[in-house]
Amino acid sequence: PNTIVVNIASGLDTRCYRMQEKYVRWYNVDLPETMKIREKFLTENGPVYQIAKSAMDASYTNEMEYGGENVLVIIEGLSMYLSEADVLQMLSIIEKTFQNVTVMIETMSPFVVKHIKEKSIEGSHAKFTWGVKNGKNLQRLVPAFTYKGEVSLVEGMKKMIPIYCGKEGSSEAGRIPYYAGRRPRTKFDFKCVCSTKTKQVELRI
């Protein structure tokens, strides 16, 4: 309960409403044009705040009230559209700002970035640009973080959608290259923690 949540690239995510009373303050961070759309549909008040800035702009942290509380940073659906330099910049800002932070970051494998096209973004100019093989490889890029573990998107699909599971609980989807290469979730342990959608990586400082 005594935790601040920072949801980077929040879009129209509504978890902040479903998890009320389980955090001290919740900050949704996204680009100004995205926040304008969010404001049309979702009114923020109480412990929920909007910050219309890029996660690579360190000044976004100046708009937060922070007094050393535990922090959970959620980064979903973003890293695969950035350059490696941008990803490292984003994580560096988190590391330097918060004392006790857990980061959940969604990542994609380089294979998926190179060979898979996402139908949901075909009409836009967005494209996959960066991926990392696994959480341990990500940890090597951000040595201030300690690797804790990772979870594949397919594992979650097993529980949510029975059709993806075999008779003995094995994932049929995992045998298909497209799904087998989907983003994993990784955990790290150091002052900061980071996690992602496809792969969740947890980093702690």
For the regions a language model picked out, list residue spans one by one:
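Cationic, low-complexity basic patches in intrinsically disordered or flexible, solvent-exposed regions
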Residues: 192, 200-203
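Alpha-helical subdomain
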Residues: 2-196
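Compositionally biased, intrinsically disordered low-complexity segments enriched
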Residues: 52, 202-205
